[in-house]
């Protein structure tokens, strides 16, 4: 079990997380959430450890009960232009700036913080230690998974609904056989190779 997180002294704390750094296709999606202490949400946890059904149920509860929540993203073209780390930081900045209530402290999952206008702290394994980050991870994952399901309708042969764009054996096989879609990240090794850019 990860060690207990000691919260900073602040009134309005936002949690931020991202989903989709590893996939070969689609945007990296981020979320920022300020929870309402008067409307607790039971069962918040790292989105990867929850069933899809539980994530969907918590998604609805978070969007209904949170004081403020916002999504951010960086598109494949931005990822290719900036690199995945900088694109993720940009998407996190977008999520925070989209909050309709300005937080006075921001907790970010991972070991790096984007440049923000308020104090922030990176929390390793934050998605399982900080409720606000857990909530953000759920919003980001449900949103990105839905986008992959929609992409699957446009390109059913790639199996995006199953692997969510991650480089599974099936995805790599289809990429080699069919080539890249306009939604693939051209700077990622397997896509580069298929496009002959290596």
Swiss-Prot record:
A Pfam family assignment: RNase_HII
Residue intervals of the RNase H type-2 domain: 11-198
Gene Ontology CC terms: cytoplasm; ribonuclease H2 complex
Catalyzed reaction equations: Endonucleolytic cleavage to 5'-phosphomonoester
Entry keyword set: Cytoplasm, Endonuclease, Hydrolase, Manganese, Metal-binding, Nuclease
Superkingdom: Bacteria
Residues spanning the signal sequence: none
Cofactor: how bound: Manganese or magnesium. Binds 1 divalent metal ion per monomer in the absence of substrate. May bind a second metal ion after substrate binding.
Keyword Metal-binding: yes
MF terms (GO), sorted A to Z: manganese ion binding; RNA binding; RNA-DNA hybrid ribonuclease activity
Function (record text): Endonuclease that specifically degrades the RNA of RNA-DNA hybrids.
Protein known as: Ribonuclease HII
């Amino acid at each position: 079990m990860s060690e207990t997180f000691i919260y900073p002294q602040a009134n309005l704390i936002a949690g931020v997380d991202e989903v989709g750094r590893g996939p070969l296709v689609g945007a990296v999606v981020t979320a920022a959430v300020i929870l309402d202490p008067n409307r607790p949400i039971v069962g918040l946890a790292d989105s990867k450890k929850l069933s899809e059904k539980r994530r969907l149920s918590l998604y609805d509860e978070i969007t209904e009960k949170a004081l403020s929540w916002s999504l951010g993203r960086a598109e494949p073209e931005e990822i290719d232009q900036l690199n995945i780390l900088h694109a993720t930081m940009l998407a996190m900045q977008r999520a925070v700036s989209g909050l309709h209530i300005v937080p006075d402290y921001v907790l970010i999952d991972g070991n790096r913080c984007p440049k923000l206008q308020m104090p922030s702290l990176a929390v390793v394994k934050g998605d399982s230690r900080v409720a606000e980050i857990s909530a953000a991870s759920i919003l980001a994952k449900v949103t990105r998974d839905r986008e992959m399901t929609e992409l699957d309708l446009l390109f059913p042969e790639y199996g995006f609904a199953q692997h969510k764009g991650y480089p599974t054996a099936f995805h790599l096989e289809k990429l080699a056989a069919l080539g890249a879609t306009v939604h693939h990240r051209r700077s990622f090794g397997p896509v580069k190779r298929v496009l002959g850019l290596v």
